Structures are given as C-alpha cells and as structure tokens.
Amino acid sequence: MSSDKSIQREESASFNEHSLSYIRQAAEYGLYEIRGMGAKRRVPSFDDLIFLSASASRYPLEGYREKCESKTVLGTRYAKQPIELGIPITIAGMSFGSLSANVKEALGQAATQMGTSTTTGDGGMTPEERESSKTLVYQCLPSRYGFNPNDLRKADAIEMVLGQGAKPGGGGMLLGQKVSPRVAQMRTLPEGIDQRSACRHPDWTGPDDLKIKIEELREITDWKIPVYVKMGATRVREDVKLAVKAGADVVVIDGMQGGTAATQQVFIEHTGIPTLAALPLAV
C-alpha cells in the first residue's frame, strides 16, 4: 500500500551522517581529514573514578590541621638529580609552533606556581619557556626538529618520545599557517609550508637501539637528569617491559584521549586505548 507520508529513514549506527560526509569528502577531493585535539568518542577517563574515603578501617584526617603528602619524586632509578614535584600531575609536551611562545611561557609559569613540571614538545626549547619553568622536561622526538644538545643540558629531564596517544605509530604534522619565521628558523624548515614529522627515529633499526639512545643521552648530561620514555598506549605490556629493560627512569603512557596539533581523523578516533585501560597493563 502506498502512503502520502514520506518514508523516514533511520540513521545507521555504522554509517551515520558524519561518517557519510567524511566518505563523500574523501571521494571528492582524494584527501583524508586532518584535525587537532583528541578523540570525540566517549572513552573512560579519570573523571569516572570513584574514591574510597576513610571511615572505620582507615582513620580520616582533619584537612585543616593534618597535612596530606602529595610530593612525587621521579628519576630515582639512575639519575643523580631526580625531579621532585609538589603534586603528581604534570603538563605534557605541546610544541612551540602548535602553541605560541606566549602560551609556552604561560604554561611554564603555571607549572612553577603549582610545583610541577612542563614539557617542551616537538620543535625545541624557547628561551622564554626555559626562563619561566622551574622544572622543564626536554623532548627528543623522531623528527629531531629544533633538537639542540646545548638545550638538552639545560633541561631538568629528557623525554624520549616513541609515540603519542592521539596518533600511536604515526608521525606528526604542523600546518603551514603555523610555520612562522621563528618556527621555521628553529626547525630549519621553509616558512608557511605544511611539515610532517617522522613516525620513528631515523637512527634506530629496532627496539634494541632504545638502550643505546638512552645511554647516549645519559652521557651528554653526565647521568645527572632522569630519562623518560613516552609511548602511545597500544601494546602496553610489551612496550613497558622494553622501556624498563632499556634503562628508562620513567615510562610515560599516553592514552588515546591525549590531544595533538594535527593528524588524520582515523588515527585520533580509531587507534590506541584509553589511559585507564593502559595503566593495569603497565604495572
């Protein structure tokens, strides 16, 4: 029987309007979507945790007169000068380029006021960031953009980056509109051109080279400061074992909800696992 009413088609869970729009765009232009930030899908986060407070078996503290210790020490395994933080929360790496010099300086000031550390990110260290940060972690990434041994010696810790939660196994991207004259000079790149970062370190042939690179970084800094190893949360149990065996002081696990300046949409939404799922595998 025919009906005057138009047939209402329900949206498919697999091929909703957003997915169809993405497919049409890729078919028309032959390009995949590039965007920043983190996954839009709902994933378990630290906000989902529920704490067990004190009652009878655990005696409660009077917060206004009894202190709760939040000090965190990182790098006691091998470093001569471990990092001591006032809180167990740090600011992750965000590059100068994806962020302005003013923002990087502000992050350093905020971290200092809160008694914690901030991290350089891809593209190197700016003088403003070093001056404003009491505790600064210097990243060594596959791109080696802006990598400077002199700046390395100014850092309070080094973070060897193997991957990122928003794009594990994939390289980075800095859109040309953010490649200013200063960014181009620091990275030795042409101004205003989209730049891609490598997905793996150019002087490595396998996992065994991680140990060699960590030893090189320790020799450059006279074994004074901690060496972190950062990785995207994928094969967590195996990756953490390799990092520990290679001699890392600290292993950083970056879950899929971590943000990025720019990468493929499919990487952000469909690779890696959340931080909460990764932590039990890491320990």
Residue spans for each PLM region:
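Flavin-dependent oxidoreductase catalytic cores
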Residues: 85-88, 102, 106-107, 116, ...
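A cross-family glycoside hydrolase active-site/sugar-binding cleft signature
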Residues: 92, 121, 139, 159-163, ...
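C-terminal helical cap(s) of enzyme catalytic domains, especially alpha/beta-barrels
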Residues: 129, 135-137, 176-183, 260-275
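Glycine-rich phosphate/ribose-binding loops and adjacent secondary-structure elements
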Residues: 201-283
